[in-house]
């Protein structure tokens, strides 16, 4: 509102503002007016003791290209296993994440990659490069913790493949994964999804994340600080127990994590 009022005072209004979630794109036929908008926006934010993020603010004379984020453009260039083998495609995804860490595009990319891994024509390649694929997906999870559930879900799908019958081999590989993740710091979110992937396999692992300990039923400490809540309310809620864990649901989970379980939104 403050920006709109300031612009009405300082410019002729041939501006069009397009908003998508928390992204704003401002269009005009006059580049000088756009520069004036940026200057006005700086001034408005300054009055509020705020500043414009220069790294996320761009000026362009190409509305067709620059309306897309750089990670979106890069994702469109990614080859698929139709032109590459499965292993090379996995490496190309890893390279994408190194250039665009925690990109929202990674969710869509990995969902499509998961579908291709299930195709019969790729069965031989998947079995041939099984440990390498698991290792790459582990690296993707470490580099992109915001979306770690996606590579971990695919790892669970690989470990569930009946074409790899050696259970001891898969158990050893799962343990190597756990050991590799535990070398990292601040992995609470990863541990939650790693526990989900391993729970139905019977693999016993001691995770540090408090939620994981509640699932294991080994945590006697309150999960939340409720010292400020009146006792009358505390008596009505299961705040200091593991009653919020659905034990029946835990008994029904499978080692194979479906993408529907982790995809809250439809990525495109």
Predicted stretch roles:
Residues 69-268:
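Right-hand nucleic-acid polymerase module
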Residues 12-14, 22, 40, 47, ...:
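Short, flexible coil/linker segments at or flanking structured domains
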Residues 16, 31-88, 92-96:
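Polymerase palm active-site segment centered on the conserved acidic dipeptide of motif C
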Residues 1-22, 26-29, 33-36, 161-166:
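Active-site palm subdomain of RNA-directed nucleic acid polymerases
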Residues 1, 19-21, 25-26, 41, ...:
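Long, contiguous hydrophobic alpha-helical segments, chiefly transmembrane helices and signal peptides
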């Amino acid at each position: 509102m403050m920006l709109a009022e300031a612009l009405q005072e300082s410019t002729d209004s041939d501006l069009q503002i397009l908003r998508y979630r928390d992204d704003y794109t401002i269009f005009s036929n006059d580049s000088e007016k756009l520069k004036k908008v940026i200057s006005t926006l700086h001034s408005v934010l300054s009055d509020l003791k705020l500043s414009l993020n220069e790294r996320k603010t761009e000026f362009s004379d190409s509305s067709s290209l620059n309306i897309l984020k750089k990670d979106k453009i890069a994702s469109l260039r990614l080859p698929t296993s139709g032109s590459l083998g499965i292993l090379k495609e996995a490496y190309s995804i890893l390279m994408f994440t190194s250039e665009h860490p925690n990109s929202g595009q990674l969710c869509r990319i990995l969902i499509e990659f998961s579908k291709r891994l299930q195709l019969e024509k790729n069965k031989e390649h998947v079995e041939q490069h099984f440990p390498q694929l698991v290792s790459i997906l582990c690296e993707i999870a470490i580099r992109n913790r915001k979306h770690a559930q996606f590579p971990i879900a695919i790892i669970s799908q690989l470990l569930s493949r009946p074409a790899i019958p050696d259970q001891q081999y898969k158990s050893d590989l799962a343990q190597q994964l756990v050991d590799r993740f535990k070398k990292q710091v601040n992995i609470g979110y990863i541990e939650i999804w790693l526990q989900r992937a391993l729970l139905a396999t019977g693999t016993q692992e001691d995770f540090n994340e408090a939620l994981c300990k509640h699932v294991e039923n080994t945590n006697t400490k309150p999960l939340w600080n409720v010292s400020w809540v009146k006792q009358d309310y505390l008596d009505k809620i299961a705040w200091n127990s593991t009653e919020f864990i659905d034990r029946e649901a835990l008994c029904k989970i499978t080692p194979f994590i479906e993408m529907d379980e982790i995809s809250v939104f439809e990525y495109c």
